[in-house]
Every structure is written in C-alpha cells, then in structure tokens.
C-alpha cells in the first residue's frame, strides 16, 4: 500500500491526542483518506453483523423486496441491485445494499424525517446484530471527530452536539459475483464522493477500492487486516471550505480469477443533525478555503440524493 495511506495506530489517541490529530489531519489534507489500526470496534460485533448481512442477501429477491422503500428515499431498509448510480453517471452500480439508521426516542423532533429501520423477519438476529455494529461505529466516529476538532483548532467536543442525533447510516453492501462479463461501462461502484461528514469503512474481503489522488493517479487502498479506512465526506469538505477534501473514489470490477467471488463491505456514513447549518469555518477561510452559501444538512442530503437517483427529482 502506498505510504500515503500509512496506518495510524488508534492507541496514539490515548497517549497523545495532539499527535494523533496532527497525523489524521495531515492524511486527510493529502488524500481525504486515512487508515486507523487498533480501533475499538469489537470483532465479535463485526462478525455477527457480517454474518447477519450475508444471511439477508442470500434471501430471495421477493423476500428482500418487502423491505424496499422507494418512496422514502431508500434511507432505511433494502435497495435492489442496479438502483443507485454515481453523480453524473447513467449506468447503475453493480450492487445491492441495506441501510440501518438511528433509533430515535419517541419524542425526537427528527422523527418525521428519520424513519425507523424495518425489522427483517426472515433473519431473527439481523436487527440486534446490525444495530450493535451501528452503535459502536457511531461512537468511534464521534471520537475521530474529536481529533478533527483539535486539528482544526476547535474545542475537542465541538462536533459532539452537532452529530448526536445525526441521520447517520450503516450501509451493508453486497457486490454479487460476476459470473459473466458485466455490461460495458458498468462497475461495482463508479467514481463518486461521499455525501456525509466522515465515512468509516472496514477492510473489504475482496480488493477493489481505489482513491483518485490530486496527482491524477488512481491509488489502490488495501488496508491491513482489522483496520478501518476513514474518509472525509462532502459535508466536512463544505464546512472546511475544501481544506479537508472529499476525495473521489470507486470500487472497480474484480480481476477475472476473482470475478466468481462476492464482495461485502460495511461503510458507516456519519451525518450531522438534520437542522445543522453547514457554513465555512473562519479559520479555514483564512487558509484559503472556498466560500459557499450556508445550507442545512438535511437540505444538502436531499439535494445529493436526487443527484444519485435514490430520491425522485
């Protein structure tokens, strides 16, 4: 793996917060990505969520389709193969996925726009296993944002109350085997950027993730086993005026000898609270960051979901 993605040990955060924040921020500035080793997400929680996901995707198309909410923007439940496309792309990605969202209290002001995640009847352990994983990724993501705060010379807890009820999503991805050559111009996930604040991604079983460096080269990301890949999303890029970039990335089709194997992936998309107003931080503008009009996290999300075909324009 390129030294641009040199792993950062999470233990450094416990030993020297400023040193960890500096390394994380430097990696984000250079590539928009970072690799973290020794993360606190329990392996048993990861394994149980992955097993539940594989059991769900093994169900019949008819069974999975029961959990498809096309009218709700597909922000919860199942999205079928060939539905989502990258911004500016006509061809749909070669994937299917499931979204697990935050469980809100009954009196939450966000309940009208943040639906409950459907319970999968056919896989009894699915709800508990995936939400346990969601919870641990959410907690770790907030810890990483504390490091981002320090890097941006903000109070360590600056992000805490801005993401505590965020519309964050655990996406369980399944890229099916390619028994036959895929249609011309299609890939598992076309070049795109993430919409959210930061994304946490566990190392995939099958290779394929590539990042577009500012040099114009596509760089393969093959993190050490058990590590997490973290990347900046468009919301963080907008907040920082581009000081922390949301980098274009993709998942390419497998080599012929690996085409018969499926690929599973579990990105966690950490979002702001829906009513948070995204506007550029003054210190980032002083660095030369780009000014953009203020916009709420929810309005920005819906704008982007329309662009990628998950919400009707």
Name each model feature, range by range.
Residues 1-313:
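Peripheral, non-catalytic segments flanking oxidoreductase cores
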